A protein has these predicted regions:
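Acetyl-CoA-dependent GNAT
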Residues: 7-80, 85-86, 98-100, 104, ...
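Hydrophobic alpha-helical segments, especially transmembrane helices
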Residues: 81-82, 90, 115, 126
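C-terminal "cap" of GNAT-fold acetyltransferases
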Residues: 3, 111-114, 118-131, 135-170
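Loop/helix-junction capping segments adjacent to catalytic residues or to phosphate/diphosphate-binding pockets
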Residues: 10-14, 91, 122
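Active-site acidic-Proline motif in GNAT/NAT acetyltransferases
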Residues: 85-91, 119-120
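Conserved G/P- and acidic residue-centered "switch" motifs that form tight phosphate/ATP-binding loops
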Residues: 61, 92, 109
Length: 170
């Protein structure tokens, strides 16, 4: 069973920090995460309410993944740090996390959500496209050549219906 939890206390922050550290280990040679330790040390940082959110996922009670969102501009937010531990992949946890953060972002008043995805993240890109994200021109610098930039409109009626339907089944 998959359970999602918004980061609300020091224990949750410590769990998020552990997942962020695990995520950083998978991207040791990625120039986009060179100053990542500062972000880890300052959690929840830019992902704190009211402009941000950080969600943890548990599979059968075990910490499995996370996702975060923060404000980019009025009405626009950015999804970051979607990560599922390798031992929990293939169970739909990433999809649950993305759909939950989309719903949270819409409830926070954002109308669009953006993200960037490096070339090696093919599975994540397929997930984003299956949910309804579309490619856009670069909106920020990412030092990884071939990075794709995506956006989704959060007040899309079909997306809202999809999220409501999934709420009934999770």
């Amino acid at each position: 069973m998959i359970k999602l939890q918004t980061v609300e206390n020091a224990d949750h922050v410590a769990q998020a920090r552990a997942l962020f550290q695990e995520y950083a280990e998978t991207r040791k040679h990625d120039p986009a995460v060179e100053n990542f330790q500062e972000e880890i040390d300052n959690l929840p940082g830019k992902y704190a309410a009211p402009d941000g959110n950080l969600i943890l996922a548990y599979s059968d009670g075990k910490l499995a993944g996370c996702v975060a969102v923060h404000k980019l501009a009025d009405g626009v937010c950015e999804m970051k740090r979607l990560y599922v531990s390798p031992r929990f992949r293939g169970r739909g946890i990433g999809r649950h996390l993305v759909e939950a953060i989309l719903k949270q972002a819409a409830m926070m008043g954002y109308s669009r959500l953006r993200l960037d995805s490096i070339p090696s993240m093919k599975e994540a890109q397929a997930l984003y496209e299956s949910i309804g994200f579309y490619e856009i021109p670069a909106y920020r610098h990412n030092p990884n050549e071939g990075t794709k930039y995506y956006e989704i409109e959060l007040h899309n009626k079909s997306m809202n219906l999809m999220l409501r339907k999934r709420d009934l089944t999770t």
